[in-house]
Design a protein with these regions (language model features):
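Flexible, acidic loop-helix segments that line cofactor/substrate-binding pockets
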Residues: 67-87
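Short acidic/histidine-rich active-site segments
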Residues: 1-12, 16-18, 23-29
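C-terminal non-catalytic regions of proteins with extracellular/luminal or membrane-system context
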Residues: 1-10, 32-46, 58, 81, ...
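Long, well-ordered, tryptophan-enriched scaffold segments
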Residues: 21-22, 28-69
Length: 278
């Protein structure tokens, strides 16, 4: 409400939020920093604070948190339940049902088993598929695209290539207490691109796994340019020039301008940030 111009500063935000009935400040520390002083200065009613406290205490009582403050937290149970086969199967099914086929020209999908396929793009190997708010998710638990393909199909006639970095050289993204750094030289980028182009020339079909990094979506990530990263646009351009049978698998967490993608691909499959089993 400060950034949107409703309040001038953190103190005013504390007053207006409390008066509006917001009982808990989960993230900012604004209540902790200001409420006691504001009560002492007479800028906010102590009765109002007491009412908020009572609502919080009543909720905790209903949830049984006074008798068992840690509720279902159990390290042994967590090891048995988190990432168990049943949950991974559900995660895979949820991902599958979320995919959207945006284009399928000449019914190029599904791909025939006899096809020679080049899997190309930064998302062929990336495990960062969980989205911006998956705080305790660990990328090492994610099945990436190459692993998934090799687990399900005969890969004799397949090859796997990064084609480009996710964003380009000397890039740093920060968000949600995380950071992603990338540093590649122009020579390294050209070598990756050339390898992918050569593979595309030899393939019947190119599956191009491209999109935005997970930290490009979420809070405070507005961008004047909502196309796929420039270096991946270059990859799409070069690959589509040597092979007209391009299938794009698109990874992203927000709406994108896909006009360039759609014009150069025979099929486009939107898979979002598909999660652990995506």
């Amino acid at each position: 409400i400060i950034y949107h111009g409703y309040c001038a500063d953190r103190e005013e935000a504390a007053v207006r939020s409390a008066e509006a009935g917001v009982d808990i400040d989960m993230m900012t520390g604004i209540y902790c920093e200001n409420l006691c002083r504001l009560v002492r200065e007479g800028k906010i009613s102590e009765d109002l604070i007491n009412e908020s406290c009572m609502r919080i205490l009543e909720l905790k009582n209903k949830l049984g948190l006074f008798e068992n403050p840690y509720k279902d937290a159990d390290e042994t149970k967590e090891k048995e339940v988190i990432l168990c086969k049943e949950h991974r199967d559900l995660a895979r099914e949820a991902a599958r049902k979320s995919f959207v086929l945006l284009k399928n020209e000449e019914k190029i999908l599904p791909l025939g088993k006899e096809k020679k396929i080049a899997w190309v793009g930064p998302y062929v190997h990336s495990r960062n598929l969980m989205g911006s708010w998956s705080f305790i998710g660990d990328a090492k638990d994610v099945t990436n695209l190459e692993e998934a393909v090799k687990a399900q199909a005969d890969t004799t006639n397949m090859s796997f290539h990064a084609g480009s970095p996710m964003l380009g050289s000397d890039i740093r993204l920060e968000g949600f207490g995380e950071a992603m750094e990338q540093s590649t030289t122009p020579e390294e980028e050209e070598a990756m691109l050339l390898e992918a182009v050569n593979a595309a020339k030899e393939a019947d079909v190119v599956v191009l796994a491209i999109g935005e990094d997970r930290l490009q979506s979420g809070e405070a990530t507005s961008n004047a340019n909502i196309r796929i990263p420039e270096i991946q646009q270059r990859l799409l351009e070069r690959v589509s020039k040597v092979n007209e049978n391009v299938v794009v698998v698109l990874f992203n967490g927000r709406p994108l301008d896909l006009r360039d993608v759609v014009s150069k691909a025979k099929a486009v499959l939107e898979v979002w940030m598909p999660g652990t089993e995506g």
